[in-house]
C-alpha cells in the first residue's frame, strides 16, 4: 500500500446547516402594571411564537418582573422594588399583579446605625380576597429629647413589647383589606408610619419601614378581578378591531397567489 497523502477528499455526510437567527422565532409582548401605579407600561418581554402545542401566552403566565417603584410612579428618589407576576395575556399585553416587595440593599445599609438597637418583626396575615402575605418590618431606636447619653439601647423586655405592637399594627392594617388596598398602603409606606406612631409610647423609634412583603399563598386567578385592575389595558378580543376605511375603498388586487 502506497504511503502518502490521499487527495480524494470525501465530503462529510450532510451539508453545513444554515445559521438561523433565534430572534426570528420570537415576538414581543408589553408588560402592563396594575392601576395602583402611575406608569402602566413598564417594559417588554420576549417569548417564542406559538408552534404546535406550545402556546406563547401559556409560556408567559407565571413570569415575574422586578420594577423599581421610582419607575412605576415617576419619582426619582425611591428605594423600594416591586415584583409583578404575569397572570393573563390579552392580545399583546401581559396583565400582571402584585407578587412581592423589597427594599434596595443600598437603603438597608444606609439606615443601619451604631449605638442604636435594631428591632425586626414579621408575621403572616391573610387578606379578604384569600392571599396570605408574610410582612417584615424593621426599626431602630431613637435618642429621646435632651438625651446626653451617647447610646440609645433598650431592654430585651421592651423589645418584645415593641415587636408585639408591630405585629398588632400589621394585622390591623392588612387583615381587613384586599390585595389592591394593601399595595396602595405599601406605596407611601403608611403602615411603617403607623407603627412608628404606635410604638413611640414604649420607646422612641426612627427609620421604621416595611422591609419586605412576599406572598406565601395565593388563591386561584380571578380573571374578573384581574381585568378590573387593568381596565384600560385590555385589548380587543377575538372579534377584532374596527378599522376606519373610506366608503369607496377597494382592497388591492393580488398579482400572485
Swiss-Prot record:
An example Gene Ontology molecular-function term: structural constituent of ribosome
Keywords from the named record: Cytoplasm, Ribonucleoprotein, Ribosomal protein
A GO cellular-component term linked to this record: cytosol
Biased composition annotated in UniProt, kind: Basic and acidic residues: 239-248
Compartments where located: Cytoplasm
Residue ranges, annotated region (Disordered): 237-257
One of the GO BP terms on file: translation
Major localisation: cytoplasm
HAMAP family documented for this protein: Ribosomal_eS1_euk (MF_03122)
Family classification: Belongs to the eukaryotic ribosomal protein eS1 family.
Subunit structure: Component of the small ribosomal subunit. Mature ribosomes consist of a small (40S) and a large (60S) subunit. The 40S subunit contains about 33 different proteins and 1 molecule of RNA (18S). The 60S subunit contains about 49 different proteins and 3 molecules of RNA (28S, 5.8S and 5S).
PANTHER family for this protein: 40S RIBOSOMAL PROTEIN S3A
Entry protein name: Small ribosomal subunit protein eS1
Organism from which the protein derives: Caenorhabditis elegans
